[in-house]
UniProtKB/Swiss-Prot annotation:
GO terms for cellular component: cytosolic large ribosomal subunit. The keyword GTP-binding does not apply. PANTHER family: LARGE RIBOSOMAL SUBUNIT PROTEIN BL27M, RIBOSOMAL PROTEIN L27. Transmembrane segments: none annotated. Pfam families: Ribosomal_L27. GO terms for molecular function: structural constituent of ribosome. Keywords: Ribonucleoprotein, Ribosomal protein. InterPro entries: Ribosomal_bL27 (IPR001684), Ribosomal_bL27_CS (IPR018261). One of its GO terms (biological process) is translation. Gene3D superfamilies: 2.40.50.100. Residues 1-20 are annotated as: Disordered. This is Large ribosomal subunit protein bL27. The lineage of its organism: Bacteria, Pseudomonadati, Pseudomonadota, Betaproteobacteria, Burkholderiales. Belongs to the bacterial ribosomal protein bL27 family.
């Protein structure tokens, strides 16, 4: 018998590419206007003073300065602020 049975097929072997989410500039670090501070899915962190939000919920600096993370309210909402450079 010189025959070989067909091998079974597998439904595994795929994985999605990582999206590189998270904090890009930490508290106290300097940032330029337009610089990305946080990449996120949904508003885990909310924009504060001198911070804008993109259509994919990315937080970015509107002015040059230093990043400052704070919490606000009873639910402890995470806010991201940029303190302008003097």
């Amino acid at each position: 018998m010189a025959h070989k049975k067909a091998g079974g097929s597998s439904r595994n072997g795929r994985d999605s590419e990582s999206k590189r989410l998270g904090v890009k500039v930490y508290g106290g670090q300097a940032i330029l206007a337009g610089g990305i501070i946080v990449r996120q899915r949904g508003t885990r962190m909310h924009p504060g003073e001198n911070v804008g939000i993109g259509k994919d919920h990315t937080l970015f600096a509107l002015t040059d300065g230093h990043v400052k993370f704070t919490t606000k309210g009873a639910g402890k909402k995470h806010m991201v602020n940029v303190v302008p450079a003097v």
